[in-house]
């Protein structure tokens, strides 16, 4: 902790790749009429300054050091809006002591990338006459391009009924919402800001950005809650990529390739299956992919069908030992089981049975089904999940359906089922930091879901058909049209690499996808892995695949894992699949880039574009590339990044190019 001199002192610290400047304020400066004082956190990317005047804290300025541009501000740092009474703000609350500047220690074993990096933080404590205490922090990690602000609100001896928490209210020329839904950040040329919560809201009015979160329940006496916001700086023309770098640092777990089998459409389709079925499929995939073709399998997801719906999240009689034998068998292939659970109870007939069982046991429900935010059901559901980790070593959960986002259940500590789901995931990660969490139905493309979950649902039906061609070609078109319309257009800052796309489908219970008479499976596989998605699901009945199908699957899965560091940059290019327009995905890294294009039409199509636009090349990047087809001829072609290039695509062709800078 730095020492405070009589008037003020300036502390200048230099470490690899960053420079931090702090101005400390003397306690004497808090007297009425004292001149304003300032303190700053800064590195090579971003600088932020706050002012202390008359015992209050305000923003002063932000500088984007990539562009040398500065935003001036005199805004409050936080405002807490009570349901009754006066607003609690960074200017109105009593500051208990001068700002403290301290180290942010690294946590080398954390599952979160940012926590592994040291940095510095400013901290101030506030209090009001009623005993409400607020701890404000501003944090800057070494080598990052953003500053996070965190506010922890401690209620005193009485509950604190708050309606809204405001953490962003600044002048931001050119500001616009990145998407229409909740949890959408605000962007402005080379800046981004946001309230780090998927249920948050932002508004832009006359170049001023405001972000807040609404609350229904009071903060209970003696309890505390923490909220956070981010302000980031980007390079010119690199808004998406630099925002993605922030998200990759702060998300619950960094991007990772997670290849696994899913039993839906194969073992069960609203049917019950048993231990023997599960062990057999583990062996089938393990032998074909791991033993014969040296593919790394991460998990085996057992979807709806493992439980007895009349008992509520207990195994059906076909699993006398639970997942014990499945876990043992999966371990022989260096994998582990995953499990499907539906917080709201699932779907159709099994859901009705689960609801009947829940009501008989006194668990809370709402119009969507089971209420995860209900005190009794939350404890039961959490304990069921914990048992899956402790007893069977599951390494992923598929949480299918999270219920209401607005209704408060009587006696609950949560504002909604979504709020309860977020809290549950936090508890599970404390138990098993590398657990994979797939949060499906009910989500939407707010990037802030990834502060909790690893992936969310793309939207739409599990599978359906759009466009023209064979059933498999029309399924591919449908899948990708849902990505385009539900995510690319609605939440462009949500990374495609973290969507649940509903996988590869070649299964006995999958409507019109239980065979492949047109031999289009390779197109599905190549396009799927070309998206860069980390949640790599195989809805596959193993006996339906030919040796050639297994070879294509294995080759592509290994290609994806090998190129993971490139593919995590995956972003959409081209048009609307449903309109039969050429589209695809592009990924860039310093040493290699990947371009995947698909023609959803039964007619040849040309696609003309500049490579620097497709790859969103940074200013100092290579301007010429050698391109090689990943799945075709070894022949290569040189492409200039600055000149328009025409790609000729055959009907339904999937073209994957690996690009090496020259």
Sequence positions of predicted segments:
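Boundary at the C-terminal end of the N-terminal hydrophobic targeting segment
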Residues: 29-33
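Conserved structural scaffold segments of CAZyme catalytic domains across common CAZy folds
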Residues: 99-338, 342-352, 533-578, 587-593, ...
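Bacterial N-terminal signal peptides that target proteins for export
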Residues: 2-18
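Active-site-adjacent "subsite" loops/lids of carbohydrate-active enzymes
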Residues: 267-272, 336-392, 403
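Active-site groove signature of glycoside hydrolases
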Residues: 294-306, 380-411
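Bacterial N-terminal signal peptides
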Residues: 16-27
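Acidic-aromatic substrate-binding/catalytic surfaces of carbohydrate-active enzymes
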Residues: 36-123, 176
